[in-house]
Regions:
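PLP-dependent aminotransferase-like
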Residues: 63, 67-110
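Conserved PLP-binding active-site segment in aminotransferase class I/II-type PLP enzymes
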Residues: 1-64, 68-69, 90
Length: 110
């Protein structure tokens, strides 16, 4: 059984560069900026923004949508806690919707 890493490109060089630079944050450094530019280009967008976590991304999404005090955000009860947390942090009201037992996705009929 061979459990060695399999690199198909410049992955090892890039990781080594990041470690050597001392800028190991997931949202700083040259590689992060390069990724944002290339991702935006691939998506046909002017800009792209990366985040350090899914929770940070959800916070930003609710803020960008203008979700705030008294707004209702529909979320499934079978989910990660951050969906609930960011809704409450935005002073919005989490509303749990039933899920389809086959897919665990929100059931549109409910």
């Amino acid at each position: 059984m061979n459990n060695q890493w399999r690199f198909t490109g410049n992955e090892l060089k890039y990781v080594t560069d990041v470690i050597a630079s001392g800028e190991g944050s997931s949202t700083s450094g040259n590689y992060n900026s390069l990724f944002e530019k290339e991702f935006a280009k691939k998506c046909g967008a002017k800009y792209a923004v990366t985040f350090n976590s899914g929770t940070s991304t959800l916070h930003a999404a609710l803020h960008a949508l203008g979700v705030g005090y008294g707004d209702e955000v529909i979320i499934p009860p079978v989910t990660v806690i951050s969906n609930f947390d960011v809704t409450v942090a935005a002073n919005a009201i989490p509303v749990f919707a039933d899920v389809d037992p086959e897919t665990f996705n929100i059931c549109p009929k409910e």
